[in-house]
Amino acid sequence: KPIESGALKVNQSDLSFVKKFSNLVEKVDFFQFSLFKEPVAPLTASLIEKKKINYSQIVKNIKKLEKEYDLLVIEGAGGLRVPITKSKEIVDLIKSIN
């Protein structure tokens, strides 16, 4: 889950929960690139919390993970049309990583 909103702390994120019950040894921030407290769309959360979402870095990080793992399961945030930045939505992220 590269972008998550509605998590009070990193150790309370969805990814932390998955990591707890899996064999992953990497730190959560190795997989999770943007975490927000507000339980709203990523763009809205980033504006409220004044934290920029670096879309191109997220794509780059995911492509790096693709080289390290045989299989990636990537959870989005809401539906396909959920805004990530002012110009990018979840559907764009899917297209960017194929």
Regions found by a protein language model. Name each.
Residues 1-52, 56, 61-64:
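N-terminal phosphate/diphosphate-binding loop that engages ATP/GTP or pyrophosphate donors
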Residues 28-29, 70-72:
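Structural motif
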Residues 57, 64, 71, 76-98:
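Conserved catalytic-core segment of NTP-binding enzymes
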